[in-house]
Amino acid sequence: LDYLKALGINNLRVLVGADGKDGIPTKAEPALQVEAGVYNDTIFDGLDFFLSELDKRDMYAVLFLNNSWEWSGGYSQYLYWAGHGEVPMPNVAGWDAFSNYVAQYAKSEKAHHLFRDHITYVVNRVNRYTGKKYSEDPAIMSWQIGNEPRPFGEDNKKSFAAWIADCAALIKSMDSNHLVSIGSEGMAGCEGDLSLWTSIHADANVDYTTIHIWPNNWGWIDKKDIPGTIGQAIENTCFYIDMHVQEAFKINKPLVLEEFGLPRDSVKFTSNTSTVQRDRYYRAVFDIVEKHAAEKGVFQGCNFWAWGGFAEPQH
C-alpha cells in the first residue's frame, strides 16, 4: 500500500472474497465463502486488516461482491449451490458449455437469494480492527454488485436488469453512506446493447457508471503483430470511451474506466518480457483520462487491472 500510495494511487478495486471449495484449477484460493453462508474467518480477518490499513493512508476501496467468471466462484458457484448441477469449467468443458451454464443465473431465484444473503452478511460485518461496521467504514468508496456482470443471452436481459436493480436497492437499504456501482464492462457486457447499459445505470440506487476495455480479449489487436495493430486498438478505445461518456452524460452520472490492460510484447507473463506496446497503450489511455479531467466532465477516473504486488504467499 505504501508503494501504491507513493505512486499517487488512492483507489483500489478489490474482490471481497472467492466462493466455493479450494483445490479447483483456475479458481482463486483460499476462498472466503466456502459453502453458502459459511465463511473462512481468516480471510475475513485479512479484509478487515486491509481496510483498516487503507484508512490510515487515506486510500479507498471499491469492493465487488460477485463475478460472472469462474476464477472466484461467482455466478457458477451460486448456481451450483442452488442445485443447477456441476459447473462445466471453461478450461475443461469449453466456453460455450460454461456460458450456457451461467446463463441460468439471470433467472435463478434460489441463486439470487443466496447472493442476497451474502450481500447482507458482508455489508453488516464489523471490522475487528476498527470496530466499525463495513456500512460505516470510511475506507470503502463503493459497493460493487459484481465483476463484469452479464445477462449471458438476449432472453435474459430483462431478468438481468431486474436483478441489478434488486441488488442495488438491497445495498442502499442497509447502507446509505456508500456509493453503489455495478461493475459493468459497458456495451460489451450487455449483449452489445448500449441502451441496456444506460438503463441499468439510470437506476436511482446506482451512483455512477463503469466500463472495462480489453483490446486483446475483444480482438482489437493481433497477438502476432501487436506493433502493427496497436494503433487500431487505441482508436477503438477512444471510440468506446466516447460512446459511454455520451450515455453517462445523458443520465447525469459519473463514468469510471475501472479496468483496462494489454499483454506484454510477446504475450508472456515473465518479468523480463518487454512492454513497449503496452506502455504506448497505457499512455494513450491516461492521455484520454487527463483530457477529460481537465474538461471536468462526466469521465471522473480510472483503475487498471491488475496489481499483484511483490509478495508471494506460502499457499
Where are these regions (language model features)?
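Active-site mouth of glycoside hydrolases
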Residues: 1-221, 229-254, 260-315
